[in-house]
């Protein structure tokens, strides 16, 4: 496949028909290089919107301008920040009296029972009692947003259990509500959400099974899993034959090999995102923001699933097999072990298929908490559609595994935590300058980012 064809811009319709926009994004073909290799690197923002070494930027193909100060890389850690506070799930039981025990620090939040609507038109003025986002109404006894409503419902219906990796006092707000499921669930209970309301809703749903089937069908039509599978297959690298890498026979160290593979996969990531239903319908700036926010997790998920076919190592998109021993000798053994244990091994044990992988990656892509989005509610609605389609798919494809959907979602916190730790390593390698980092990966690392 021709390199330039792979990097076609995300929006298929002409973006420069308006005379007010500069005609710089109409085509990847013949895009001029504006920076020579002999000149010093430009500022991060100008780097992202330009090409380097005669090759176009992977993100210049999806937006006419990246110089807007409103665009930033969400949730990117810098050196010295602790990234191990990502939510993790385990077998800790949360049934019984513990369900209604509010976590420490929630008492001063006030009683939401006094927060009443004065008129039907004032409903939109309510805020979510859990995270402070815009409320969509009263759900399970509490004014809440669609995100917290869906989170609470999934927790109860799937009987999910969580644990807090901190001191059970995590801040739950619009920006950080997904960081700790344990504290988010406890806050739902503390604010008055009722478990029995979810169970009653399920019973009513059984009495209206025909309506539920129709709704599920509509969700599947809105977010068809076959389209998501097509997206995965369209960018799948040909790795029928691969080269083994070890300290004795590899000219490059594993970190260099991984960075080189990530650089190549950034282009296919753009092509993959274009094929995910409704992604191309989002504003171009939002598309850029979502890809910047999730590129590391999206790439890690891909090579982790690809690696279930090899033994004690990871299989890169370039066809190179990196052994565990090579990673340890390069000083990245700890994070390498986590990838193998928390991702590759789990995917292999449950025999995760390509459709399920694609849905998990789509969930990561549609991140409503990415900073700078023009409409986070729209992105959250798309994520909910992926949830619904994935749940329906697992029930139909694996009817003998009722807990499979929950097991799939359990991989997301681990993926998040590992993705943040990998970014820490990349920033370190970039800082010390010992590892060659290719053009497009460097652009992502130099993009403006914020710490959450």
Curated annotation (Swiss-Prot):
Domain NR LBD: 220-448
Primary location recorded for the protein, binned into one broad class: nucleus
Region feature (Disordered): 1-46
Renumbered residue ranges of the record's region Hinge: 194-217
Keyword Iron: no
SMART domains noted in UniProt: HOLI, ZnF_C4
MF GO annotations: nuclear receptor activity; nuclear steroid receptor activity; retinoic acid-responsive element binding; zinc ion binding
Cellular component aspect of the GO annotation: RNA polymerase II transcription regulator complex
Name of the protein described by the UniProt record: Retinoic acid receptor RXR-gamma-B
Organism name: Danio rerio (Zebrafish)
Name of the gene this protein is made from: rxrgb
């Amino acid at each position: 496949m021709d390199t330039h064809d792979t990097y076609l811009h995300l929006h298929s319709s002409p973006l420069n028909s308006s005379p007010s926009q500069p005609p710089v994004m109409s085509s990847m073909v013949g895009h001029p290089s504006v920076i020579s290799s002999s000149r010093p690197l430009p500022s991060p923002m100008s780097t992202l919107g330009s090409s380097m070494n005669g090759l176009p930027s992977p993100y210049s193909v999806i937006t006419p301008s990246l110089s807007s100060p409103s665009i930033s890389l969400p949730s990117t850690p810098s050196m010295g920040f602790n990234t191990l506070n990502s939510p993790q799930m385990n077998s800790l039981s949360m049934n019984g009296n513990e369900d209604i025990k509010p976590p420490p620090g929630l008492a001063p939040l006030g009683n939401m029972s006094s927060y009443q609507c004065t008129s039907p038109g004032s409903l939109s003025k309510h805020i979510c009692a859990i995270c402070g986002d815009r409320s969509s109404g009263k759900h399970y006894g509490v004014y809440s947003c669609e995100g917290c409503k869906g989170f609470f419902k999934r927790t109860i219906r799937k009987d999910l259990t969580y644990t807090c990796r901190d001191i059970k006092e995590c801040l739950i707000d619009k920006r950080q509500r997904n960081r700790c499921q344990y504290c988010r669930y406890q806050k739902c209970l503390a604010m008055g959400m009722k478990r029995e309301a979810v169970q009653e809703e399920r019973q009513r749903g059984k009495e209206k099974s025909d309506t539920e089937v129709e709704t599920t069908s509509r969700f599947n039509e809105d977010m068809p899993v076959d389209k998501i599978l097509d997206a995965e297959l369209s960018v799948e690298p040909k790795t029928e034959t691969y080269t083994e890498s070890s300290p004795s026979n590899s000219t490059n160290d594993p970190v260099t090999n991984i960075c080189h593979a990530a650089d190549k996969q950034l282009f296919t990531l753009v092509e993959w995102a274009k094929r995910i239903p409704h992604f191309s319908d989002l504003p171009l700036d939002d598309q850029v923001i979502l890809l910047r926010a999730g590129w590391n997790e999206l790439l890690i998920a891909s090579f982790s699933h690809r690696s279930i076919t090899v033994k004690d190592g990871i299989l890169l998109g370039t066809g190179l097999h990196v052994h565990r021993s090579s990673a340890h000798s390069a000083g990245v053994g700890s994070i390498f072990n986590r990838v193998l244990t928390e991702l590759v091994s789990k995917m292999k044990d449950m025999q995760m298929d390509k459709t399920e992988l694609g849905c998990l990656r789509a969930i990561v892509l549609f991140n409503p908490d990415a900073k700078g989005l023009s409409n986070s509610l729209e992105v959250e609605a798309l994520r909910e559609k992926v949830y619904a389609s994935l749940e329906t798919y697992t029930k139909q494809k694996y009817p003998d595994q009722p807990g499979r959907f929950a097991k799939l979602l359990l991989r997301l916190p681990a993926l998040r935590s590992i993705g943040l730790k990998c970014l820490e390593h990349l920033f370190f390698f970039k800082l010390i300058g010992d590892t060659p980092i290719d053009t497009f990966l460097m652009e992502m690392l130099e993009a403006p980012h914020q710490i959450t």
